[in-house]
A protein has these predicted regions:
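Sec-dependent bacterial lipoprotein signal peptides
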Residues: 1-15
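N-terminal targeting sequences that direct proteins away from the cytosol to non-cytosolic compartments
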Residues: 2, 17-230
Length: 230
């Protein structure tokens, strides 16, 4: 019989993380916390429609959480304040309005002054053009920033993993899985593994289980729930 292996993630509360420690010492370490975004924007745009659009996009609630948390913690600075450690932040979005520009575009750069870093520059000929562009490309803009955060997490987990739990998963299910540091093995059976990471004010964990595949009925919602509840 084939066996179905399922991994489930349970996040009780999203917890803040320390500033990312770069894995490459050739550049300065990027500043800031995960999912923190520096927006370099003139006062006129920030207090107008452009600022409203930026806040609506990047501080929108994260879907499916049991409490309201923004996608990004947005910190706005002016061009004058964009110096020193601020310029070394991990996530940066620059807003530029120039009437001489013919179209609205976004440029993406990586590791400009620090590592790991993403710098996005959104520029257009007018506030109206920027607002229109933001409305049409909001998902792509969020995706680029979220992907940068995920790539950093994957890189860190590959370098600083959890050999004990990774070995248990390989032995039990025959699959390789990268597990972050901090997790402990809460339970292990021939077809079940539960790992968790406890914080002072939050709990994070996942479980993996398998059961025999006996046809399409084994993949119905009822079958999945029944196997999970064993």
């Amino acid at each position: 019989l084939f066996r179905i292996t399922i991994a489930a993630l349970n996040v009780a509360t999203a917890a803040g993380c320390d500033a990312f420690k770069t894995l490459n010492n050739s550049k300065k370490s990027a500043q800031g916390k995960p999912y923190e975004l520096i927006v370099v924007c003139p006062q006129a745009e920030w207090t107008g429609e452009v600022g409203d659009s930026l806040r609506a996009i990047f501080t929108a609630p994260v879907p499916y959480l049991n409490q309201i948390e923004p996608i990004f913690d947005v910190l706005r600075v002016t061009e004058r304040g964009f110096t020193g450690m601020v310029a070394d932040h991990r996530n940066i979005l620059k807003i530029l309005v120039d009437p001489e520009l013919k179209e609205t575009t976004t440029a993406v750069q990586y590791d400009v002054t620090s590592d790991p870093q993403i710098v996005m520059t959104l520029q257009g000929p007018s506030d109206g053009a920027l607002v229109k562009y933001l409305s049409e490309n909001r998902e792509n803009l969020v995706y680029a920033l979220e992907k940068a955060e995920r790539d950093r997490a994957v890189k860190a987990n590959e370098t600083y993993g959890n050999p004990g739990i990774e070995s248990a998963i390989l032995k039990t299910f025959g699959v390789e899985m990268k597990v972050p540091k901090g997790y402990t093995l809460a339970a292990q059976k021939p077809d079940f593994i539960w790992a968790r990471n406890e914080y002072p004010t939050a709990s994070q964990g996942f479980f993996i289980y398998s059961y025999p595949y006996e046809g399409k009925q084994s993949l119905t919602e009822e079958a999945l729930v029944a196997a999970r509840n064993k």
